[in-house]
C-alpha cells in the first residue's frame, strides 16, 4: 500500500505533453524578450524589432479597446497573447503537441479571464456593475427579457472563449492528418501516383493556412479579453 501511494505521488509530478510543451513555450517567450531587450539599439536588429512590434501591437489593442485605464492590465494581456501565440506555433512543429488544442488549457485561461474581469467589475463599481446587464436604451417592456439574455450570454463567455480556440487548433491539425494519410498511397497502388501529389500540395496549403490561423486565434482570444475588460471598467450600456 505504501509503495502504491509513493508511485501515485511520483506520477503526479511527471510532466505531460501539455505541461512539457507549455514550459517550452514559456522558455521561448522569455528568450524572445531577453534577447530582444538585452542590447537595445537605435537601429534595432531582427529580434529586437520583433519584440518591439509585438509589444506595440498589443499595447495599441488594449488602449483602443479597453481605454487608457485598461493599460494597467497590459502586462497580463501581453503575456496571454504571447503564450497562446507560441503554443499555437509549437503545434506546427512535426511530432510536437499543441497545448491550446487541449480544452483543459484553454478552459483555465478563459475561466481566469472571466473570474478576473467579473471580480474587477464588482471591486470598481460594486452593485453598479450589474448595469452591464440592463439595456437602458431599449424600450422598458423589453429590458427584463434583454437582461436575462445578457446574463446568459455573459456566463457563456468562458465556454465560447475556450472552445473557439481549442476547436480551431484541433480542427486544423485533424485535417492535415487526413491529407497526410493519403500521402503514402503511392507505395501501394497506381491511384497513389495521382492522389499523393495532391495530398502533399493540400498539406502544404493547410500548413500555410495553419500559420495564419495560429496568429488569428491568438489575436481573437486577446481582443475578446480586452472587450471583457472594457465591460468591467465601463459597464454601462
UniProtKB/Swiss-Prot annotation:
Domain of life: Bacteria
Keywords assigned by UniProt, alphabetized: ATP synthesis, CF(0), Hydrogen ion transport, Ion transport, Membrane, Transmembrane, Transmembrane helix, Transport
Transmembrane segments: 18-38, 77-97, 103-123, 132-152, 185-205, 209-229
Membrane topology designation: Multi-pass membrane protein
Gene3D superfamilies: ATP synthase, F0 complex, subunit A
Signal peptide start and end residues: none
SUPFAM superfamilies reported in the protein's UniProt record: F1F0 ATP synthase subunit A
The keyword Protein transport appears for this protein: no
A GO cellular component entry from the record: plasma membrane-derived chromatophore membrane
Subcellular location: Cellular chromatophore membrane
Gene Ontology MF annotations: proton-transporting ATP synthase activity, rotational mechanism
Quaternary structure annotation from Swiss-Prot or TrEMBL: F-type ATPases have 2 components, CF(1) - the catalytic core - and CF(0) - the membrane proton channel. CF(1) has five subunits: alpha(3), beta(3), gamma(1), delta(1), epsilon(1). CF(0) has three main subunits: a(1), b(2) and c(9-12). The alpha and beta chains form an alternating ring which encloses part of the gamma chain. CF(1) is attached to CF(0) by a central stalk formed by the gamma and epsilon chains, while a peripheral stalk is formed by the delta and b chains.
Function according to Swiss-Prot or TrEMBL: Key component of the proton channel; it plays a direct role in the translocation of protons across the membrane.
Similarity comment: family membership: Belongs to the ATPase A chain family.
Name of protein: ATP synthase subunit a
Species, as recorded: Rhodobacter capsulatus
Gene: atpB
Amino acid at each position: 500500500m505504501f509503495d502504491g501511494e509513493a508511485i501515485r505521488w511520483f506520477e503526479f509530478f511527471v510532466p505531460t505533453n501539455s505541461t512539457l510543451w507549455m514550459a517550452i513555450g514559456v522558455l521561448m517567450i522569455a528568450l524572445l524578450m531577453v534577447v530582444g531587450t538585452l542590447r537595445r539599439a537605435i537601429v534595432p536588429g531582427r529580434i529586437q524589432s520583433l519584440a518591439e512590434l509585438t509589444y506595440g501591437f498589443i499595447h495599441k489593442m488594449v488602449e483602443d479597446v479597453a481605454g487608457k485605464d485598461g493599460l494597467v492590465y497590459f502586462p497580463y494581456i501581453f503575456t496571454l497573447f504571447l503564450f497562446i501565440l507560441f503554443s499555437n506555433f509549437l503545434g506546427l512543429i512535426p511530432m510536437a503537441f499543441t497545448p491550446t488544442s487541449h480544452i483543459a488549457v484553454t478552459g483555465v485561461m478563459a475561466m481566469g479571464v472571466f473570474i478576473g474581469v467579473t471580480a474587477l467589475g464588482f471591486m470598481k463599481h460594486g452593485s453598479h456593475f450589474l448595469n452591464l446587464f440592463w439595456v437602458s436604451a431599449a424600450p422598458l417592456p423589453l429590458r427584463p427579457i434583454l437582461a436575462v439574455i445578457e446574463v446568459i450570454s455573459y456566463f457563456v463567455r468562458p465556454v465560447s472563449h475556450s472552445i473557439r480556440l481549442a476547436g480551431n487548433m484541433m480542427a486544423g491539425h485533424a485535417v492535415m492528418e487526413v491529407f497526410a494519410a493519403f500521402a503514402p498511397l503511392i507505395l501501394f497502388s497506381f491511384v497513389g501516383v495521382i492522389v499523393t501529389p495532391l495530398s502533399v500540395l493540400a498539406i502544404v496549403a493547410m500548413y500555410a493556412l495553419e500559420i495564419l490561423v495560429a496568429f488569428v486565434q491568438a489575436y481573437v482570444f486577446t481582443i475578446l479579453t480586452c472587450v471583457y475588460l472594457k465591460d468591467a471598467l465601463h459597464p454601462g450600456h
